UniProtKB/Swiss-Prot annotation:
HAMAP family for this protein: PdxT
Enzyme Commission number(s) from the entry: 4.3.3.6, 3.5.1.2
PROSITE patterns hit by this protein: PDXT_SNO_1 (PS01236), PDXT_SNO_2 (PS51130)
Organism: Thermococcus gammatolerans (strain DSM 15229 / JCM 11827 / EJ3)
Transmembrane region(s): none
Family matches, as NCBIfam families: PLP_synth_Pdx2
GO biological process, alphabetically ordered: glutamine catabolic process; pyridoxal phosphate biosynthetic process; pyridoxine metabolic process
Binding of L-glutamine, residues: 53-55, 114, 142-143
Record-given protein name: Pyridoxal 5'-phosphate synthase subunit PdxT
Length: 197
């Protein structure tokens, strides 16, 4: 049975839990999706989602709750991890605009710029092209970080807004600027969860 953990310290956790549950149903896979708050819950985990929210807060709480190092180790060992918006920041190797106390997982070979699109008023929705589907995906961008550079050949673009890369994949990792959980469309979650099957 697949066990998916959504890091539930801050951010849009319940939406990700619902999206992952729907995606598992669509894939015909039995599994559970849990609200992941402490290291003990990582036992038997099949995949992890790091949701959007505020990256400074998520970073601080992951350190405080003892999740940062165990999650990094699991990512290095090949466990599927998807980060959306602030979760992308948490996965990234380099972060422009990070505060000195922020710690990141540094698993994904990308450089991102925090809050590159500006404040809440600059949030928008636009069709995103996916590498694994012909139909456009409804991309919801909320104070999104921006992928400014791919730092190695291991990183493959999987989502584009116009000609700009807004989603990447590196082996077991997926990082997205946008919020797939804020739509009824589960294609991105299904694509990610196939890594755990």
């Amino acid at each position: 049975m697949v066990k998916v953990g959504v890091i539930g310290l801050q951010g849009d956790v319940s939406e990700h839990i619902e999206a992952a549950q729907r995606a598992l149903e669509n894939l015909g896979v039995s599994g559970e999706v849990i609200w992941l708050k402490k290291p003990e819950q990582l036992e038997g985990i099949s995949a992890i989602i790091i949701p959007g929210g505020e990256s400074t807060t998520i970073s601080r709480l992951m350190q405080k709750n003892g999740l940062l190092e165990p999650v990094r180790k699991l990512g290095e060992e090949g466990l599927p991890i998807m980060g959306t918006c602030a979760g992308l920041i948490m996965l990234s190797k380099e972060v422009i605009g990070a505060t000195p106390e922020q710690r990141f997982l540094e698993l994904l070979d990308v450089k991102v710029n925090r809050n590159a699109y500006g404040r809440q008023v600059d949030s928008f929705e636009a069709p995103v092209k996916l590498a694994f589907s012909d139909e456009p995906f409804p991309g919801v961008f909320i104070r999104a970080p921006r992928i400014v550079e791919l730092l190695s050949d291991k990183v493959k673009p999987i989502a584009w807004l116009g000609d700009r890369v807004v989603g990447v994949e590196q082996d077991n990792l997926i990082g997205l600027e946008f919020h797939p959980e804020l739509t009824e469309d589960t294609r991105v979650h299904e694509y990610f969860l196939r890594k755990a099957l």
